[in-house]
């Protein structure tokens, strides 16, 4: 069961990735984690990646694909894996295909931009404990105060509206073209494509995923 998750930041991919990992026992492969692990391990690919990153450059698609290939041969990926945040672009998707990395399911989480902005911008965090609230969907008992300690809640830099809108623009420019790419792949019988309504509650989306993945 090899799965790619598509969807804008804030579309609920992380929550559902957790559900899939627990239900089906497959690992989530994050390219960021993989790069850090390779650098730490000092592997040949890791040393190459470190050299590029130390120079302040972006790691090449070829190098990331090589890391993905290496990662999916590990024992925990025997029954499959979950890719979130990769591929981000059509050249990356093409490179994956050329490297012989097959994908069984592409799952797109569809949420309108304005709802994503509302979801993210409304988040409030208690920095010390990591407790997360939402002004509309999960408000604290006392406005802007943590329920347990009564301490001030803060807004993460990533959750500020200008940052969220910038990330959405980047997503639509870079990653949205993958939707039509994987539709074509599905039409050619190379994968199965499903679009999920991410505006529903978590349990409803999880239930639909369980039906799709069996």
UniProtKB/Swiss-Prot annotation:
Keywords: ATP-binding, Cytoplasm, Kinase, Nucleotide biosynthesis, Nucleotide-binding, Transferase
Record EC number: 2.7.4.3
Binding residue positions for AMP: 31, 36, 57-59, 85-88, 92, 156, 167
Region (LID): 122-159
Complex and partners: Monomer.
Family matches, as PROSITE patterns: ADENYLATE_KINASE (PS00113)
Species of origin: Yersinia pestis
Superkingdom classification of source: Bacteria
Name of the protein: Adenylate kinase
Pathway noted in the entry: Purine metabolism; AMP biosynthesis via salvage pathway; AMP from ADP: step 1/1
Enzyme class: transferase
This protein's domain notes: Consists of three domains, a large central CORE domain and two small peripheral domains, NMPbind and LID, which undergo movements during catalysis. The LID domain closes over the site of phosphoryl transfer upon ATP binding. Assembling and dissambling the active center during each catalytic cycle provides an effective means to prevent ATP hydrolysis.
UniProt: ATP binding residues: 10-15, 123, 132-133, 200
GO cellular component, one term: cytosol
Compartments reported by the entry: Cytoplasm
CDD domains, sorted: ADK
